[in-house]
Amino acid sequence: MLWKKSLSELRELLKRGEVSPKEVVESFYDRYNQTEEKVKAYITPLYGKALKQAESLKERELPLFGIPIAVKDNILVEGEKTTCASKILENFVAPYDATVIERLKKAGALIVGKTNLDEFAMGSSTEYSAFFPTKNPWDLERVPGGSSGGSAASVAVLSAPVSLGSDTGGSIRQPASFCGVIGIKPTYGRVSRYGLVAFASSLDQIGVFGRRTEDVALVLEVISGWDEKDSTSAKVPVPEWSEEVKKEVKGLKIGLPKEFFEYELQPQVKEAFENFIKELEKEGFEIKEVSLPHVKYSIPTYYIIAPSEASSNLARYDGVRYGYRAKEYKDIFEMYARTRDEGFGPEVKRRIMLGTFALSAGYYDAYYLKAQKVRRLITNDFLKAFEEVDVIASPTTPTLPFKFGERLENPIEMYLSDILTVPANLAGLPAISIPIAWKDGLPVGGQLIGKHWDETTLLQISYLWEQKFKHYEKIPLT
């Protein structure tokens, strides 16, 4: 049962030649065949191609030699479809590899599939995929979270040991919480966005899902670092996280923002989080209340900035150069209008309209410009809090995973499921969600937010918690 082994264990076996990359891929392919019909995590499975590629892998010393990885379908993999779960890109084939994919391939990894998401990464439940919803492996009547629901579910059911996602307002951390896995969003600029289909360019960041901290740390190490093709990627040295994670963390101060606890938290989530904090206290962490006075404006700020950037980024899908084109139209203007009307789903249209309004003449200063100023205030609140504490902690989501359809009628309800994750994106801070409990058979995630460029501390606390709680031993659908 190779699919039950962690990435680190697989690495050892592969390095020593005790198993071959082909055998590893076959094992995860078997697991995919057992679970995929129920969960529907993938838009395009690529196990067959990975098996062929596995045969030509020779360099055992590579950091990810023979390791299968699933990839969110808004990240380009050369020669494969990249649909963004949208009708408008249903048949689009990526002409090149995203930088992160290039780095994974160089490290010896094998891409085993493109995973489902909310269309163009806009959503919190993967219900907005134009193709089908992905299901939560812990309860098939509930959502896996979003927008990276497919990536989170694939790691939860172990059809892949690790996966890549993107996080604009919580799209890695929220599904990680709902699916009971680890999900990290690095500092903005830590990982190249070249080849990630843009949603909101000043917020998007690629990150990693996994079941073990060490696994997540290693993959993050491989994909991080400056890239000349992305002007927002930073020339900051990449730590050896795969080694750093095991180092002892002592004497840290953890801040609890009082504003986060003024939101309505589901009792099960509140109880799980309080227990998590008690356990950390026992480990010698000092717990301190901090204040983020402007954080209450995060959701309105985010829902001006993100849709504004999206309306600009999505203007390119007009039926001219690539993607879907309407069949019947009288002139070019009607072609644009029809293509976009038929190609985009309801949530994407909603956000394009919101953004176009916020950027329109006469409203730009009142909305977009003002939101950017509030964003600065939110960032300053975090910087001030980090003068007193090393890490900020909160639940990842205010509720347990919700049922399908429960929030579709009310977009604001859906938006509020990201209320605890959006602030880290606005401030460009690194943040991780780790499984802290199972309540009523459903996973609960705890979020840790770090100082800029300090993913190390987040991973170290995650590793420490994992040693105690051993959440990775729980596997759904077995």
Swiss-Prot record:
Organism, scientific name: Aquifex aeolicus (strain VF5)
Catalysed conversion reaction: L-glutamyl-tRNA(Gln) + L-glutamine + ATP + H2O = L-glutaminyl-tRNA(Gln) + L-glutamate + ADP + phosphate + H(+)
HAMAP family hit by this protein: GatA
Annotated function: Allows the formation of correctly charged Gln-tRNA(Gln) through the transamidation of misacylated Glu-tRNA(Gln) in organisms which lack glutaminyl-tRNA synthetase. The reaction takes place in the presence of glutamine and ATP through an activated gamma-phospho-Glu-tRNA(Gln).
One Gene Ontology term, aspect cellular component: glutamyl-tRNA(Gln) amidotransferase complex
Gene Ontology annotations of biological process type: translation
Protein origin, superkingdom: Bacteria
Record-annotated active site: K72 (charge relay system), S147 (charge relay system), S171 (acyl-ester intermediate)
Quaternary state and interactors: Heterotrimer of A, B and C subunits.
Name of the protein in question: Glutamyl-tRNA(Gln) amidotransferase subunit A
Tagged with keyword Ligase: yes
EC number from the UniProt entry: 6.3.5.7
Keyword terms of this UniProt record: ATP-binding, Ligase, Nucleotide-binding, Protein biosynthesis
Any GO molecular function: glutaminyl-tRNA synthase (glutamine-hydrolyzing) activity
UniProt family annotation: Belongs to the amidase family. GatA subfamily.
Entry-linked PANTHER family: GLUTAMYL-TRNA(GLN) AMIDOTRANSFERASE SUBUNIT A (PTHR11895:SF151), TRANSAMIDASE (PTHR11895)
Enzyme class, UniProt record, top EC level: ligase
One Pfam family this sequence matches: Amidase
